[in-house]
């Protein structure tokens, strides 16, 4: 769908509480020319979140209207709330050579891979289920029954890891962030990307023989 001069598309997925959002934010700090695609959602805004930065917060009527208009490249209902990724947002950035990261769940990842076969997908897993539960509890965002639901769903989500290109264990946050950064840097150096980016240099070097 995009040329070799365009940006790269990355999918980062994980079970709820797996740390994907924190890792993606760290990745943006570490790497230039890369942005997070801001999704639309019908869930309530959480403390500390900002409109248009973390999500575009809309009601269900607006969301369904956007679905019917074909505004989303992927959308899914997760824990009774809708999430969707804007086609226009992704394509605009890719066309300008900006890498785009999608912070989504495995359902969204599956839809994205169909639309963008060259997308690079990364699955983040916790070091243990106990660690995952502890992280969910430490967030202080959900009631006990919601945490139980998330833990049950997490075991199903973890079973989808073979569908992804890369697997990162988020045990040591800094190490996991560096591994995610390494994937992005290595992908940028692929021959099909470099052959256009370094066309002038390659031409000069070869003509000097």
Swiss-Prot record:
EC number: 2.7.4.8
GO CC aspect terms: cytosol
Purpose: Essential for recycling GMP and indirectly, cGMP.
Keywords: ATP-binding, Cytoplasm, Kinase, Nucleotide-binding, Transferase
Gene that produces this protein: gmk
NCBIfam families hit by this protein: guanyl_kin
Transport keyword on record: no
Organism: Legionella pneumophila subsp. pneumophila (strain Philadelphia 1 / ATCC 33152 / DSM 7513)
All residue ranges annotated as the Guanylate kinase-like domain in the record: 7-185
Family annotation (Gene3D superfamilies): Guanylate Kinase phosphate binding domain, P-loop containing nucleotide triphosphate hydrolases
SUPFAM superfamilies: P-loop containing nucleoside triphosphate hydrolases
UniProt lineage: Bacteria, Pseudomonadati, Pseudomonadota, Gammaproteobacteria, Legionellales
Name this polypeptide is given: Guanylate kinase
A GO term for molecular function: ATP binding
PANTHER family in alphabetical order: GUANYLATE KINASE, GUANYLATE KINASE-RELATED
Reactions this protein catalyses: GMP + ATP = GDP + ADP
Superkingdom per UniProt: Bacteria
InterPro entries: GK/Ca_channel_bsu, Guanylate_kin-like_dom, Guanylate_kinase, Guanylate_kinase_CS, P-loop_NTPase
Enzyme class: transferase
Cellular compartment(s): Cytoplasm
Assigned protein family: Belongs to the guanylate kinase family.
Residue sites binding ATP per the record: 14-21
Keyword tRNA-binding: no
């Amino acid at each position: 769908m995009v040329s070799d001069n365009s940006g790269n598309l990355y999918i980062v997925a994980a079970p709820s509480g797996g740390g994907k959002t924190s890792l993606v934010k760290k990745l943006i700090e570490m790497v230039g020319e890369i942005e997070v695609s801001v999704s639309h959602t019908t869930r309530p805004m959480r403390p500390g979140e900002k409109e248009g930065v973390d999500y575009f917060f809309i009601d269900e009527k607006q969301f369904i209207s956007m679905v019917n208009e074909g505004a989303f490249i992927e959308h899914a209902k997760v824990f009774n709330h809708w999430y969707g990724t804007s086609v226009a947002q992704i394509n605009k950035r890719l066309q300008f050579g900006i890498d785009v990261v999608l912070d989504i769940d495995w359902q969204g990842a599956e839809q994205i891979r169909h639309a963008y076969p060259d997308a690079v997908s990364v699955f983040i897993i916790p070091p243990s289920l106990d660690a995952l539960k502890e992280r969910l509890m430490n967030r202080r965002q959900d009631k006990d029954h919601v945490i139980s639901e998330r833990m049950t769903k997490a075991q199903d989500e973890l079973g989808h890891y073979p569908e992804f290109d890369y697997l990162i264990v988020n045990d040591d946050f800094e190490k996991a962030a560096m591994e995610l950064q390494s994937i992005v840097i290595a992908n940028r150096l692929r021959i099909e990307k470099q052959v256009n980016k370094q066309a002038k240099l390659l031409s000069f070097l070869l003509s000097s023989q």
